[in-house]
Amino acid sequence: MRLGVLDVGSNTIHLQVMDAHLGARPEPATSFKVELRLTEYLDAAGSITPQGIDLLHQAVGDSVAHANENQTDEILAFATSAIRDAKNGPKIIQDINQRHQIDLQILTGDEEARMTFLAVRRWLGWSAGKLLVIDIGGGSLEIASGVDENPEATLSLPLGAARLTRDFLSGDPYTSKGVKFLEEFVSSKLEDEIPSILRAHDANHFVATSKTFRTLARLSGHMFSENPKHLESANLKTMISKLADMTNKSRAELPGVSNSRAQQIVAGAIVARATMNALDLDRVEICPWALREGVVLRRLDWLNN
């Protein structure tokens, strides 16, 4: 079976076409991605602007066309925090589904955390023991912990890298005042919101996933000559200082940092460090599987049952 996973996120509209079969790992076949930072198309009332909606329709239409050109059997389409939190999100979803003949669903933060956790569990296997999984997206932060394929505790907070960059950081390079204020805001938010069940996680394996963490791990490997499959909390403090002092153009020239991510990587690093500190983690392992793989695995499980 060839499945197309259409991820309508805060930074990109990303179609990943995978060959997926019961009992086998999903294998990527082709992908199509449009960079569209939806958080930049929010008006004062919190609605996505007409320009943003037009660009979104174009990106979704091109993605569906790519899926059809590659003989995709089914498109699994989902939207995360950018549309979930937009005032006109439900109307946008309705219009997209009617125009493009797909079934785009809004995932809750809890669903995001659970499906990402499932992907990490399947990647690492049962021998990894109890997992604590962290995922920083463009619009939100998800944390999940548990011993099974279904986490026993999840948390979703509006601490995504794109959202925080838009709300807190200005200048090029960013002002030291803005960076400091963002660090204090994130630390305070985590202190208030992380429940005791996640603080006292007693996990055996600490895992981070998705693009922000992969980029940070690669940068850490470049700056400190370390294994890019792991990320150390101690390195993040130095990285934040260095990255914040650079211009967007200079950050975009670093290994693994695209032009679109160059603006957000400072906020992403701040959230990563604050989250690791709040959970008392010195190091996390980077997992290549995340939400999209979790969506495919959940669909295969449903078909099997």
Range-by-range predicted roles:
Residues 10, 138, 211-214:
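Short, glycine/acidic-enriched loop or turn micro-motifs at the edges of active sites
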Residues 139-145:
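Acidic, divalent-metal-coordinating active-site segment for phosphoryl/phosphodiester hydrolysis
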Residues 22-37, 42, 61, 67-68:
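Conserved ATP-binding subdomain of kinase catalytic cores across diverse folds
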Residues 3, 17, 41-72, 80-130, ...:
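Helical "lid/coupling" subdomains associated with nucleotide-phosphate turnover
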Residues 1-27:
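N-terminal basic/disordered segments at the start of proteins
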Residues 77:
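Dinucleotide-binding Rossmann-like beta1-alpha1 core, especially the glycine-rich loop
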